[in-house]
Amino acid sequence: MTEIPAKQITDNDILKDVYKSQNKQFSIDAIDILDLEELKDVQRRKRTEFEGYLKRNRLDVKQWMRYAVFEIEQHDMRRARSIFERALRVHISYVPLWIRYIESELKLGYINHARNILERAITKLPRVDKLWYKYLIVEESLAHFDIVRNLFQKWCSLEPAAHVWDSFTDFEVRQERYEDVRNIYSKYVLIHPQFSTWRKWINFEVRYGSTKTVRSVYSLALDALIAYSESRNELVDDCINLIVEFSKWEALQKEYIRSKSLLEIAIQKWPKSNTLNNALLQFEREHGTAETLENTIILNRKKHYEDILNEKVYDYDTWLLYLQLLENNYPKLVMEAFSNVLNAAIPTSRTKDKYWKQYILIWIKYLTFLELTINDIPLCGQKFEELIHNIIPNDDFTFSKIWILYAEFEIRQDNLEKARSILGRSLGLCPKRKTFKYYIDLETKLREFDRVRILYENFLKFDPLNLDTWRAYVEFEDSLGDEVRVRSVCMIPIQNNIGLFSKSFQLHLLEILIDYEMEYQNFDNIEPLLKKQVELSNFTVEAWTDYAMKKLTVPTEEQVQNFQIMKEERLKDSSALDEQEIEFEFEITDNNKDNARDVFERALNYFKEIKRDEDRARILQSYVDFEGQYGDISSRQRIEKRLPSIVNGIKDIDGLKTQNITYTFPDDENKSNIDTSNILALAHKWKESQEAKSR
């Protein structure tokens, strides 16, 4: 038989047992009592049990309370009082014991006994609010209002918490003794001088007092809090909140001058207070004119910006907003503000980060202000020099925009040579693409083409791998109609004598040169360029295909001659016709197609020789596509017959099986068949000659 496993005891079971044993109470068995002697016997036994338990554990206050309740149930109040007194000697600070003692006396109607116990309780435990409130509730329920008042006065002499004073004032309000309430508040604010206390007094006066008393309390509160705030900074916010409320109250009384004056005087004392500034702004919105409202808003914004800048001197966004505000509303302060930011907020980093960019933006705003707003040209030029030589660390980085703005400034002053000198200095100290482009554009507009060529040459020395610069240089020479220089500029990277340029870079310029040669109608120069293009492309299928398609668009010598004859005839017929207006046009003939086919054949031979079967198959497919577009059905079918058959196999290399694709070209098989036929024919001819000799 299989044994039934015993139930496992978990930690939760152990904790439950401990909890039950701790909460197990001393129980009293229910006994049926038939006569007085049995009652006395039961009482004696129960008292013995209680006494025995308390001897063992005299600190169990709840058991003392059960003992006292038992005696009360036996209608023996004398014994119950004795037990309560014994318990108090053990735990005099246990408040529930006092409360149970007091409530027991009250339930049985022993008011004087309860009052005596309450007196003892508040004397022994004067800081326990519950005992005081119990005493007050008892006396007020008995309508002993004088005793209640005396108790409150006695309690308040101990300088208790704010809720005690609030209870005292609420009691006097219920008795409608408003002067006594004012006397209480006059002492209350001395003990708790914070704004919340004064607000309670003010609310009382608003409800039960007059305008005069409300204003008087506001004034007292303001004087007191300001005096306290001199030594206690935490009361400053209370003062400000009180002033705002005082101002609102005065506005409700339609005393607008008083209301605004309060805020303005307070702002003079605490100019950085957002609460006061917002309150003044709100006052102007509700009671001011459009002009005063706008002035207040602007003033608040100005103070707000100044507060931020005092803490964050490198907050350039705020500086820009602040300067814009001053320009529009306080023009006399603008120069001082510019001086402050430009001298105090110079970035400390030696890298061109966002702080430098924002700082330079402020300089640009300053220089624009000097030139256009106050028209101080000498000072503007002086500040440009200061910025360039003393502020910007040109050894580490520079700002092309500043050099360009300086040059434009001198151009506006008709100092062209100085502008050139400035741009030249910029390129000498710290050359930048933006500066080169601007200088080139300037000289181009001035039609100083020799200077432009020099600048382009220096630009390419500075940044020779910038394709856009080479393209721009070529376009510039093309705009002047100088074919030789266009070709020379393009050939520098293409020839790549110093090995600086990558093949992709050379291919880009080669494309540009081919397009220009086509435009100039120098068709004889295109063939070597196309071959060079294929070579630089590592003889890829795409390069050969592109070569063939471009070869298709290159006219033959006959087509060029026909075009020249046609052009001469048209020029004779129309004297007003310009030679450049006649575009070169020709139809694609079989000769053009044969030229393209020749390229495809060369590509096939090339891939066959180097045994690149996959590329050979791809160029054949391109050849088929070409014939499909430009050839006829027979030419297309002829090329399609040359397409290879593909056989997929598996090759074992060092134990690893990989897929192997084999291409079989019909061209190769035909050649093999031709070679075999020739050998057989020769053998047959040799045999016949031998037979003839033997005869």
From Swiss-Prot:
Listed Gene3D superfamilies: Tetratricopeptide repeat domain
Organism for this UniProt entry: Candida glabrata (strain ATCC 2001 / BCRC 20586 / JCM 3761 / NBRC 0622 / NRRL Y-65 / CBS 138)
Record carries keyword Nucleus: yes
Gene Ontology process terms (BP): cis assembly of pre-catalytic spliceosome; DNA replication initiation
Each HAT repeat, start to end: 41-73, 75-107, 109-141, 143-174, 176-207, 296-328, 333-365, 375-412, 414-445, 447-479, 521-553, 591-629
Cellular localisation: Nucleus
Family: Belongs to the crooked-neck family.
Cited InterPro entries: HAT, HAT_Syf1-like_N, Syf1-like, TPR-like_helical_dom_sf
Protein name (database record): Pre-mRNA-splicing factor CLF1
